[in-house]
Regions:
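Phosphate- and other anionic-substrate recognition elements at nucleic-acid/protein interfaces
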Residues: 2-3, 10-121
Length: 121
Protein backbone atom coordinates (compact mmCIF):
# COMPACT_ATOMS: atom_id res chain seq x y z
CA UNK A 1 0.00 0.00 0.00
CA UNK A 2 1.42 3.35 -1.01
CA UNK A 3 1.47 6.25 1.41
CA UNK A 4 1.62 9.91 0.43
CA UNK A 5 3.08 12.67 2.61
CA UNK A 6 1.95 16.27 2.45
CA UNK A 7 4.08 19.28 3.33
CA UNK A 8 1.28 21.85 3.62
CA UNK A 9 1.91 25.47 2.77
CA UNK A 10 -0.31 28.49 2.40
CA UNK A 11 0.51 28.92 -1.30
CA UNK A 12 1.87 25.53 -2.36
CA UNK A 13 2.17 22.05 -0.91
CA UNK A 14 4.69 19.32 -1.52
CA UNK A 15 3.78 15.67 -2.01
CA UNK A 16 5.93 12.57 -1.66
CA UNK A 17 5.02 8.93 -2.20
CA UNK A 18 6.30 5.66 -0.80
CA UNK A 19 7.34 2.67 -2.85
CA UNK A 20 5.15 -0.45 -2.80
CA UNK A 21 7.20 -1.97 0.04
CA UNK A 22 6.63 1.05 2.26
CA UNK A 23 10.36 1.43 2.86
CA UNK A 24 11.43 4.30 0.62
CA UNK A 25 9.97 7.73 -0.05
CA UNK A 26 10.47 9.86 -3.13
CA UNK A 27 9.31 13.36 -4.03
CA UNK A 28 6.15 13.31 -6.13
CA UNK A 29 5.25 16.91 -7.00
CA UNK A 30 4.52 20.37 -5.71
CA UNK A 31 1.03 21.74 -6.30
CA UNK A 32 -0.77 24.98 -5.51
CA UNK A 33 -2.48 24.39 -2.16
CA UNK A 34 -5.83 25.45 -3.59
CA UNK A 35 -5.55 22.44 -5.97
CA UNK A 36 -4.63 20.00 -3.20
CA UNK A 37 -8.16 18.59 -2.65
CA UNK A 38 -8.42 17.62 -6.33
CA UNK A 39 -4.92 16.13 -6.26
CA UNK A 40 -5.72 14.02 -3.18
CA UNK A 41 -9.00 12.85 -4.71
CA UNK A 42 -7.04 11.61 -7.73
CA UNK A 43 -4.47 9.89 -5.51
CA UNK A 44 -7.21 8.09 -3.57
CA UNK A 45 -8.77 7.03 -6.88
CA UNK A 46 -5.34 5.65 -7.80
CA UNK A 47 -5.29 3.52 -4.65
CA UNK A 48 -3.60 5.69 -2.01
CA UNK A 49 -5.41 5.19 1.28
CA UNK A 50 -3.07 6.93 3.75
CA UNK A 51 -1.84 10.50 3.88
CA UNK A 52 0.86 11.60 6.31
CA UNK A 53 0.73 15.31 6.99
CA UNK A 54 3.69 17.25 8.31
CA UNK A 55 2.79 19.16 11.46
CA UNK A 56 5.33 21.52 13.03
CA UNK A 57 6.18 21.87 16.68
CA UNK A 58 7.48 24.93 18.49
CA UNK A 59 11.02 25.09 19.86
CA UNK A 60 9.53 23.83 23.15
CA UNK A 61 8.13 20.76 21.39
CA UNK A 62 4.55 21.97 21.68
CA UNK A 63 1.92 22.29 18.99
CA UNK A 64 1.55 25.97 18.16
CA UNK A 65 -0.40 28.24 15.82
CA UNK A 66 1.02 26.71 12.66
CA UNK A 67 0.03 23.22 13.85
CA UNK A 68 -3.50 24.49 14.50
CA UNK A 69 -3.61 25.83 10.94
CA UNK A 70 -2.47 22.43 9.63
CA UNK A 71 -5.17 20.70 11.69
CA UNK A 72 -7.83 22.97 10.15
CA UNK A 73 -6.57 22.26 6.64
CA UNK A 74 -6.54 18.51 7.27
CA UNK A 75 -10.16 18.58 8.41
CA UNK A 76 -11.05 20.20 5.08
CA UNK A 77 -8.99 17.66 3.16
CA UNK A 78 -10.72 14.77 4.95
CA UNK A 79 -14.04 16.01 3.57
CA UNK A 80 -12.68 16.48 0.05
CA UNK A 81 -10.68 13.23 -0.07
CA UNK A 82 -11.75 10.72 2.60
CA UNK A 83 -8.82 8.53 3.66
CA UNK A 84 -6.67 7.75 6.67
CA UNK A 85 -4.77 10.91 7.71
CA UNK A 86 -1.89 10.78 10.18
CA UNK A 87 0.54 13.40 11.43
CA UNK A 88 4.33 13.37 11.45
CA UNK A 89 6.58 16.02 12.98
CA UNK A 90 7.92 18.16 10.14
CA UNK A 91 10.40 20.13 12.21
CA UNK A 92 13.56 20.58 10.17
CA UNK A 93 12.23 18.85 7.05
CA UNK A 94 12.85 21.82 4.74
CA UNK A 95 16.40 22.32 6.03
CA UNK A 96 17.19 18.60 5.77
CA UNK A 97 15.83 18.47 2.24
CA UNK A 98 17.90 21.51 1.23
CA UNK A 99 21.01 19.97 2.81
CA UNK A 100 20.57 17.04 0.41
CA UNK A 101 20.30 19.39 -2.57
CA UNK A 102 16.52 19.47 -2.85
CA UNK A 103 14.94 22.69 -1.68
CA UNK A 104 11.49 21.90 -3.09
CA UNK A 105 8.31 21.41 -1.11
CA UNK A 106 8.12 17.88 -2.52
CA UNK A 107 11.62 17.28 -1.14
CA UNK A 108 10.47 18.36 2.32
CA UNK A 109 7.49 16.01 1.97
CA UNK A 110 9.95 13.21 1.15
CA UNK A 111 11.83 13.89 4.39
CA UNK A 112 8.55 13.83 6.34
CA UNK A 113 7.47 10.57 4.72
CA UNK A 114 10.84 8.86 5.13
CA UNK A 115 10.80 9.71 8.84
CA UNK A 116 7.32 8.25 9.12
CA UNK A 117 8.29 5.06 7.26
CA UNK A 118 11.54 4.61 9.21
CA UNK A 119 9.68 4.88 12.52
CA UNK A 120 7.42 2.00 11.51
CA UNK A 121 10.00 -0.50 10.22
Amino acid sequence: MKTVAIDLGAARSGLAISDESGLLARPLKTVPTKELPDELRQLTADGVSRFVVGRPRTLDGELGKQAAWVDTQVERLKVAAPANYEYEDETGSTAESAAHGDDSDAGAARVILQGYLDART
